[in-house]
A protein has these predicted regions:
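Amphipathic coiled-coil/heptad-repeat helices and related helical stalk/stem segments
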Residues: 28, 119, 229, 281-284
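Amphipathic alpha-helical segments that form the core helices of the histone-fold
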Residues: 33, 229-233
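Conserved beta-strand-loop-beta-strand hairpin that lines the nucleotide-binding pocket
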Residues: 121, 182-185, 234-312
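Conserved short strand/loop->alpha-helix "switch" segment adjacent to the catalytic nucleotide/phosphoryl-transfer site
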Residues: 202-230
């Protein structure tokens, strides 16, 4: 990784395959130290177990490093690019930036995983032309084989067993498309639905809040829900054909709700990257990602479904 980084003028995005803590430290610690020695900004955004592992290994030398608990900051994979990666890189314009980002860990749910894979694929577009190196570790001892297949498809370089080699299966756009699948229907639980147009936007919001309270959403999340519902329903009216349907139900520890409309999201980075400061609008879906614990989307010509999860 260090050799790749030293020669890099622009974006580098390797996957690191590791089997144990020793292999994890053997690559990541020299990568961090090389960045610090070069005066480069370094961030580490990984699950808390690995965060503490790296923090302990670096000791006082790690003081300049920005440590981020990915299980909190990246709980929703859709906000990792804007809130974690871009936020750090944009804070250091002109510098070569190093980031260790581990968005996929053992224990990610089946609902979260497709959003993780799309996130990894989208990084390659979000940082085109930027002087950034983002190393993404993958625990080969615990993650499913398909996860490693997807990692090879979303990273142009794979670091394993001390070597860094081009990935022969690198195809991020194919990954983005292949994980854009219809969302599974809820089963075995009551689902409440409401159809809306511009005149019924206030009623749609009231409908969701009323059912969310009945389904056990805590007071601390109601403002998040209100904001997200307002953004998505307004987006349906303005960009999604003028009408939509909102559905809400409870699923395990989550409140789940979704908006269906006749629009089509043509840019897969929509909601994943902050728009330029001088561009009016374009922040609605971004805000939805910020306040939700998970956002899943299926979009096609003539219809889009956006599903949001909030812990109750």
């Amino acid at each position: 990784v260090n050799d790749v980084t030293a020669e890099a003028e622009l974006f580098v995005h390797p996957a690191l395959f590791y089997r144990n803590q020793s292999e994890y430290l053997a690559v990541n610690v020299p990568f961090i130290r090389a960045g610090l020695d070069a005066g480069e900004p370094v961030a580490v955004a990984v699950p808390r177990e690995n965060l503490e592992l790296l923090r302990g290994e670096l000791g006082e030398d790690g003081a300049p490093v920005r440590f981020i608990d990915m299980q909190q900051a990246g709980r929703n994979p859709g906000r990792i690019i804007p809130r974690v990666l871009r936020a750090f890189a944009d804070a250091h314009p002109g510098a070569h930036v190093r980031i260790i980002g581990e968005p996929v860990w053992f224990g990610r749910s089946a609902e979260e995983y497709p959003a993780c894979v799309q996130h990894e694929a989208l990084i390659n577009h979000a940082f085109t032309g930027r002087r950034v190196t983002i190393v993404c570790p993958y625990d080969t001892a615990r993650l499913a084989p398909q996860v490693l297949v997807d990692a090879r498809a979303t990273h142009p370089v794979v670091v394993a067993d001390g070597e860094h080699l081009p990935s022969g299966s690198y195809a991020p756009d194919h990954v983005i498309a292949s994980y854009n699948q219809p969302l599974s229907r809820p089963s075995g639980v009551p689902v409440f639905s409401f159809s809306f147009d511009a005149a019924l936007l206030p009623d749609a919001r009231h409908f969701v809040i009323e059912h969310a309270v009945a389904l056990g959403l805590g007071d601390g999340r109601r403002d998040d829900l209100t904001l997200a519902v307002a953004e998505l329903t307004t987006n349906s009216v303005v960009h999604g054909g003028g009408t939509g349907v909102i559905r809400i139900w409870a699923e395990d520890e989550h409140l789940v709700w979704q908006v269906e409309d006749g629009g089509h999201i043509g840019d897969p980075l929509a909601g994943r990257c902050p728009p330029p400061p001088d561009r009016p609008g374009g922040r609605g879906l971004l805000l939805v990602h910020y306040v939700s614990d998970l956002v899943r989307t299926h979009t096609r010509p003539g219809g889009t479904t956006t599903r949001c999860y909030l812990r109750r």
